[in-house]
Structures are given as C-alpha cells and as structure tokens.
C-alpha cells in the first residue's frame, strides 16, 4: 500500500474515530475463560474463528434443530440506570433458551451480540459473565458473538444486547400442542419477578410515581425486585420430559398469560385460568397500585408470577406436581383445558 497521507494534516486512526481495537481484543481475552467453562463436548473449536463449529450430539434418530433469537428489551435501560450489569446476561440467555424448551428442544449453543457507542471493557465483561452463568444454568455452550463499537449510534457506553440459540429435539418428541385435549391440566411454574418483559411500562410507573428504588417491596429493595434475573427452566423441564408426556408448554413473556398460552393451543381449545390459584407476587402488586394499572392490562403485559405453563393430561397432573416439587420447583395447578365455543377468547381468566 502506498502512503498517501499528507504531511500537512494529522494522521487519523480508527481510535480517533471512536473505535478502540485494543479494547475489543482485551474483551475477547476476558471472554475466553467464560466460554471455556460452558463448553460442551460437541464444541469443535475455541473462540476467535470466523465461525463456531459444533458437532451434532449422538443418540438421535431424526434430530431436528430449533433456533431462537431475543433480547431483554428496556430492562437494559434500568440496568444502565442502576449500573447493574452482572445479571442482564442471564436474562438474555433465559429469553432464548426458555423459548426453545417450549418445543421440547435441549439448548446446544449460544451466541451474543453486544453493540455500544463506546466500549467499556469492564461493563461488557460483566455482561458476558452473566451470559456465561446463564449458559451454565441452561447446559449450553457460549461459542461466540459479536462486539460492535459504533460511535454516534449509541450514547456513550450505553449498549444493546441480542442473543441467538440453537437446540435439538428428536422429531418424534417435538412438543407443539397438537395433543392438547379437553380436561388437560395446566400447571404453573413461578417467575422470579417481571423477568424481561413489561419494562417500558415499569419505567413509566417509576417515572410518574417518583418511586424510591430503595423502598422495601416484599422484603427486598425495589431495585433488586425489578432486576431479579429471568428464571431458566431448561434442566427441570428436560428431566420432566423423560418422566411423562408433556403436551404443551408456554413461556410467559410479553403479552402475559392472555397472549402466550393461545400460541400453543389447538383452534378448538381454550385455557381456563384460576387467578386465585397462585400468590400474586409483591412486586406486581406494587406496580399495579403505583401505576393504577387495570387487571386486564396487568395480565396482558406481565407474567404476574407465572413464568412457564405446562399442559399435561389430568391423569399425569399429580405425578408432574410431585416430580417438579422434588426437583426444587414450587408448581401449582392454575387451570384446565375446556372446549372453545364460537366467539370465545382462548384464555379465560377467572378472578373470583
């Protein structure tokens, strides 16, 4: 390459434009140990290549790959406001792997995308540490990702996150809701809080109520209740699949119970939910009161204490409850499947 720079003007570098290659390399080195501790035996190469290599696990007759991608929404804004970055990576993994387990798939590997205006290696390393923790909880490998430093696109060291995960399921064992029938039992698994949904409304409530984030809510500061990481249900549910026939699963994310349960129901079925069958967690009561939020809006925005819904036959319900309890869960029967009449909604919330 011929040097065409002018001796009369300063020599510009990528760093002058706001991109610090050395900081990016430093982050990669710090990430390697995180990736190493999540490594499954099927991973064929370490970090740093152009693409991650992953061998399909043995023991499948007709393996089907299942993929998903997600983010954590405006929970990120609250994380930045509170300068708490160590658990947001768990949220990112949870949002992806919990979607995969709904189809019966075991998560295999995970990749992340981290975009920022100015790379703070310390903040990014905290985020990736959380991603590694999430991958360990889900039993999948962190095999790579992308860190994009884009000055002018984001303010300062503000950042955005996206995750991508691939899982595997035996074709004959795909869970798609097609077996759901009248009389089936619906079991709820508790959430840890709002998880990663509804945070635009949460932030609005905080704003209009001039909330004190150190206020006690259910025995912990409000800031902790709102930043509690999303639960990862993967290992418990994989064990349940080996124990009995699970007909459908619904990950209760944005849209709440009313929008997510219909995604796994046949057209002729409805879910009747008894809202008195579980305890409404204090953080949701606080949000509803401070924001004067209607019941209907609560149930279509937040998980309201139910992070995952499991559909099993009535004959298997007691065994499922017992198994989940022995596994350390706190399951509760929240309703049943009934025939859908013309003009009815697929989720009926009974709030007696």
From Swiss-Prot:
Keywords: ATP-binding, Cytoplasm, Ligase, Nucleotide-binding, Purine biosynthesis. Its main location: cytoplasm. GO terms for biological process: 'de novo' IMP biosynthetic process; adenine biosynthetic process. GO terms for molecular function: ATP binding; phosphoribosylamine-glycine ligase activity; phosphoribosylformylglycinamidine cyclo-ligase activity. It is found in: Cytoplasm. It comes from the Bacteria. Pathway: Purine metabolism; IMP biosynthesis via de novo pathway; 5-amino-1-(5-phospho-D-ribosyl)imidazole from N(2)-formyl-N(1)-(5-phospho-D-ribosyl)glycinamide: step 2/2. Pfam families: AIRS, AIRS_C. It catalyses: 2-formamido-N(1)-(5-O-phospho-beta-D-ribosyl)acetamidine + ATP = 5-amino-1-(5-phospho-beta-D-ribosyl)imidazole + ADP + phosphate + H(+). Its EC number is 6.3.3.1. One of its GO terms (cellular component) is cytosol. Belongs to the AIR synthase family. This is Phosphoribosylformylglycinamidine cyclo-ligase. It comes from Teredinibacter turnerae (strain ATCC 39867 / T7901).
């Amino acid at each position: 390459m011929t040097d065409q720079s002018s001796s009369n003007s300063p020599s510009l570098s990528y760093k002058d434009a706001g991109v610090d290659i050395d900081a990016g390399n430093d982050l990669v080195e710090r990430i390697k140990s995180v990736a190493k501790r999540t490594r499954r035996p099927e991973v064929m190469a370490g970090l740093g290549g152009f693409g991650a290599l992953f061998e399909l696990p043995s023991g499948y007759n007709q393996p089907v790959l299942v993929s998903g991608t997600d983010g954590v929404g405006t929970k990120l804004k609250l994380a930045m406001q509170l300068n708490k970055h160590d658990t947001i990576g768990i949220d990112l993994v949870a949002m992806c792997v919990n979607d995969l387990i709904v189809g019966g798939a075991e998560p295999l590997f995970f990749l992340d995308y981290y975009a920022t205006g100015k790379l703070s290696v310390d903040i990014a390393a905290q985020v990736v540490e959380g991603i590694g923790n999430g991958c360990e909880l889900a039993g999948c490998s962190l095999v790579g990702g992308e860190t994009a430093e884009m000055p002018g696109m984001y303010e300062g060291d503000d950042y955005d996150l996206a995750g991508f995960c691939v899982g595997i399921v035996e074709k004959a064992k795909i869970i798609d809701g097609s077996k759901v029938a009248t009389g089936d039992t619906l079991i709820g698994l508790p959430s840890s809080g709002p998880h990663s949904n509804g945070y635009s409304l949460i932030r609005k409530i905080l704003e209009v109520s001039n909330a004190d984030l150190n206020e006690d809510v259910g025995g912990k500061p409000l800031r902790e209740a709102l930043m509690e990481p999303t639960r990862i249900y993967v290992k418990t549910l994989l064990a349940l699949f080996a124990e009995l026939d699970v007909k459908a699963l619904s990950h209760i994310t944005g849209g709440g119970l009313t929008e997510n349960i219909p995604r796994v129901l046949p057209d002729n079925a409805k879910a009747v939910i008894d809202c008195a069958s579980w305890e409404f967690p204090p953080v949701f009561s606080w949000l509803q009161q401070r924001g004067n939020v209607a019941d209907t809006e609560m149930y279509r925005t937040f998980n309201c204490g139910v992070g995952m819904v499991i559909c099993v036959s009535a004959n298997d319900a007691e065994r499922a409850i017992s198994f989940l309890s022995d596994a350390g869960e706190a399951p509760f029967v929240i309703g049943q499947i009934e025939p859908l009449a013309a003009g009815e909604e697929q989720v009926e919330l009974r709030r007696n």
